[in-house]
Amino acid sequence: MLQRTLGSGWGVLLPGLLIAGLMYADLSSDQWRIVILMGLVLTPMMLYHKQLRHYILLPSCLALIAGIMLMIMNLNQG
């Protein structure tokens, strides 16, 4: 299923499915911020790792999609 390099479709689809699963966990805003922070911290770490460099889209798209979810939550509250 996953080859040596991760194509852009898989790099967006897998974090999107993970965020969809987390959406049903009813996370608070602070917990969504932690998910974003984890994605932002993992991205440069994976960039400098020789083998994980091929999967760089996973944490960056995780942070992006979690940020979009946080914006949607804030719009629904206000």
Curated annotation (Swiss-Prot):
This is Uncharacterized protein YjjZ. InterPro entries: DUF1435. Pfam families: DUF1435. It comes from Escherichia coli (strain K12).
